[in-house]
Amino acid sequence: MKALKRYGQNFLVDRNILGVMMKQAGLSENDCVLEIGPGHGVLTREILAQKVKCLHCVELDERLRPELEGIRDERLILHWGDAVKYDYSSLEPFPNKVIANIPYKITTPLIWELLKFADRGLRYMLLMLQKEAAERITALPDTKARYPLGVCIDAVGMARVVRRVPPQCFRPAPKVDSAVVEIEITRNFVLTGSELWSEVLHLGFAHRRKTLANNLKGISLPEGLGEKRAEDLSA
């Protein structure tokens, strides 16, 4: 089956990378997992082999329905739709972990959406991302790569690059390098669902060279914070 460019399909096929991801995720029979874009089910089968409690898969490409429905496992729950627009609040049982090779063009909006469910019990994500996106998410304070999503993740937990992944590990091979990124959500669970918090972060980065006081006029800021720039923020 030909991969569709409009869906950003680059299927992970390297067994060594799959093994690295499974070892890193440390899955157990208590975990309910969400996979975004299961494709041909290669990662799906690896997750099910870890004896997880259940696995939700959200897939947009209806051409993959026969192949995915052919995976006979009562723990597998298939959902069809756009991952960015999907109503994740309807998932039962609700996942505590996300493991996915996600289409790179939806990386930022998808992670923002998933973070909203920290107060429902989502605590962990292991994601295959474009290397550039991985570097931005894990960028340190006071660096040019720093952006709102990275600051938000810092406020609720941590993110780190686990492994860099070359193009030949995918079919078709993307034109960019990739990386496996681990995100742990350990605190401030309600914060990720706050529209005000998201708005403040984005406004803070609207003009990177300006201080927070200038970008957030009309908002009362703690002493000393107004002179900082958004990229200087840390947890």
Annotate each predicted stretch with a short phrase.
Residues M1-L203:
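Catalytic cores of RNA-modifying enzymes
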Residues I185, L201-A235:
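C-terminal lobe and adjacent flexible extensions of AdoMet/dcAdoMet transferase-like proteins
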